[in-house]
Amino acid sequence: MAKAKFERIKPHVNVGTIGHVDHGKTTLTAAISHVLAKTYGGEAKDFSQIDNAPEERERGITINTSHIEYDTPSRHYAHVDCPGHADYVKNMITGAAQMDGAILVVASTDGPMPQTREHILLSRQVGVPFIIVFMNKCDMVDDEELLELVEMEVRELLSEYDFPGDDLPVIQGSALKALEGEPEWEAKILELAAALDSYIPEPQRDIDKPFLLPIEDVFSISGRGTVVTGRVERGIVRVGDEVEIVGVRATTKTTCTGVEMFRKLLDEGRAGENCGILLRGTKRDDVERGQVLAKPGSINPHTTFESEVYVLSKEEGGRHTPFFKGYRPQFYFRTTDVTGTIELPEGVEMVMPGDNIKMVVTLICPIAMDEGLRFAIREGGRTVGAGVVAKIIA
């Protein structure tokens, strides 16, 4: 019996708070929870419940994250908040909390600070598509001109990293005052919620994206041909569809002549399902684990890319020593390890466990990839890092 399907009447959107330490990310998270629960119904979460973030493990990396949910009249939001800067870095790089949009919190008493910049850069690198600014602690600034100055600074900083700094919404408010129930500041939280609704477009569901299945196994069935198995990552494949086999070697085209799930024949395989795909005229040796089956033209194989990487600390089971240029680990994409070489940024001689770093990777064979694809860095099967493809070079 298949599990009951998770049906929601309203569209579901993933967001999160980012910004410098002590600028009020967690207070804002609590304020949104309270004001929206009070206005539209739902359960309010307190600061202490959010601040006490449970520890999670994502690909062997320990991350502290708080997840809360809230509703506006038109949408359901899942919101992530992290206690420490390192948690943000890990969260964004591993994709543990994929964000459809982020709320950048900037204290108007301080203006943009080092982590403000770093979180904007990370958002750009890992592909957070939209940023909305909440200028916090505005109740503590009497000077209107000072607020304007801070807003200008934040907008310029966002433009510097290719976000539309001039056009994105900036809300001036006070999370603490809103949490204390002061109507003029509660109104600012509702303004922020309205900005989330209008500025972040409804995300495309996995099922509506072009078909892609990472190949895990290949079988030959006498009299029927070759079957590849795996979990459909996105889209739908139907019997009779033309598909491409991409990665590792030259791309080839074939046709899906059958879809099987739990030994039953189906007309189609959909995102999230584990299935076997029968391929016309394909030999057992033409396909291997590590390739993907995809809608023709939807994804290309690449070998060289810029990435943002988090290197596991010794405590997380990572390396005990730094690595240098010339380091040649394995890069694990979807279902397979590929050896690659790295190029460190100018002036960087070595990378310490626990660091995050931008690096250019060149693989020894091509892998089907898009910007935003996550990977692990491994040494002999042990994970020592996590990364994301920021920009494809070749």
UniProtKB/Swiss-Prot annotation:
Family matches, as SUPFAM superfamilies: EF-Tu/eEF-1alpha/eIF2-gamma C-terminal domain (SSF50465), P-loop containing nucleoside triphosphate hydrolases (SSF52540), Translation proteins (SSF50447)
Region spans: G2: 60-64
Keyword Transport: no
Example of a GO cellular component annotation carried by this entry: cytosol
Main location (coarse class): cytoplasm
Pfam families per UniProt: GTP_EFTU, GTP_EFTU_D2, GTP_EFTU_D3
Keywords: Cytoplasm, Elongation factor, GTP-binding, Hydrolase, Magnesium, Metal-binding, Nucleotide-binding, Protein biosynthesis
Broad enzyme group: hydrolase
GO molecular function, one term: guanosine tetraphosphate binding
Region described as G5: 174-176
Domain tr-type G: 10-204
Keyword Magnesium: yes
Region annotation G4: where it falls in the sequence: 136-139
InterPro entries hit by this protein: EF-Tu_GTP-bd, EF-Tu_GTPase, EFTu-like_2, EFTU_2, G_TR_CS, P-loop_NTPase, Small_GTP-bd, T_Tr_GTP-bd_dom
Subunit structure: Monomer.
Family: Belongs to the TRAFAC class translation factor GTPase superfamily. Classic translation factor GTPase family. EF-Tu/EF-1A subfamily.
Protein name: Elongation factor Tu
Species of provenance: Shewanella putrefaciens (strain CN-32 / ATCC BAA-453)
Taxonomic lineage: Bacteria, Pseudomonadati, Pseudomonadota, Gammaproteobacteria, Alteromonadales
Gene: tuf1
